């Protein structure tokens, strides 16, 4: 027959295991999209690094390589991966025009297991003769077998605040 001390140890072990399981479950339900948020944030970081190296082709890898990709901005809507890529290359023909890109104020809204809307601000720090520019963006992301990709980008420039 187990002693009082052995029973107490067994009860404490069971209690510790139960609390551990409950704590793990509550953490995973607190943010069910934490891995997705991290994956998308990583892709945005890769884009930022590629842009700051002057590599538009590498920057474009976060976009869905499809004729159904869309980009909306002040010059209208471009349709298709190649059209979006051409738009970037025409608008930013050299490193000085590209400047240094920073993203900030990211907001994530998941529309299900395979969809997300990411809002944020972008800022290009450029030489004085080009001038800094920035604005806001809305990116619609979709999960594909190869990972998350931007399927629609709506980017707007904002007038600098004085």
Located regions from the model:
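Short, low-complexity N-terminal intrinsically disordered segments enriched in polar/charged residues
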Residues: 12, 17-62, 161-162
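A solvent-exposed, acidic/Ser-Thr-rich amphipathic alpha-helical stretch
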Residues: 34-41, 56-114
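Short beta-strand edge/turn micro-motifs at domain boundaries
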Residues: 27, 134-161
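Hydrophobic/aromatic beta-strand elements that line small-molecule binding cavities or substrate pockets
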Residues: 88-89, 103-109, 122-124, 136-142, ...
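Solvent-exposed loop/turn segments at secondary-structure junctions
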Residues: 76-78, 124-125, 156-158
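Short, cysteine-centered beta-strand-loop-beta hairpins and adjacent loop/turn segments enriched
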Residues: 95-97, 124-132
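Bacterial N-terminal signal peptides that target proteins for export
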Residues: 1-11
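A short hydrophobic beta-strand element
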Residues: 113-122
């Amino acid at each position: 027959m187990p002693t009082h001390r052995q029973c107490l140890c067994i009860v404490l072990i069971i209690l510790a295991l139960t609390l551990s399981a409950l704590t793990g479950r509550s953490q995973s339900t607190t943010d069910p999209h934490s891995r997705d948020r991290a994956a998308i944030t990583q892709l945005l970081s890769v884009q930022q690094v590629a842009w700051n190296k002057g590599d538009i082709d590498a920057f474009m890898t976060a976009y869905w390589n499809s004729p159904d990709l869309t980009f909306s901005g002040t010059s209208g809507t471009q349709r298709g991966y190649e059209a979006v890529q051409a738009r970037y290359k025409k608008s930013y023909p050299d490193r000085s025009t590209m400047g240094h890109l920073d993203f900030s104020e990211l907001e994530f809204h998941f529309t299900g297991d395979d969809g997300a809307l990411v809002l944020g601000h972008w800022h290009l720090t450029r030489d004085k003769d080009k001038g800094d520019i920035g604005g806001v963006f809305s990116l619609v992301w979709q999960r594909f077998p190869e990972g998350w990709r931007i399927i629609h980008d709506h980017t707007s420039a904002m007038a600098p605040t004085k």
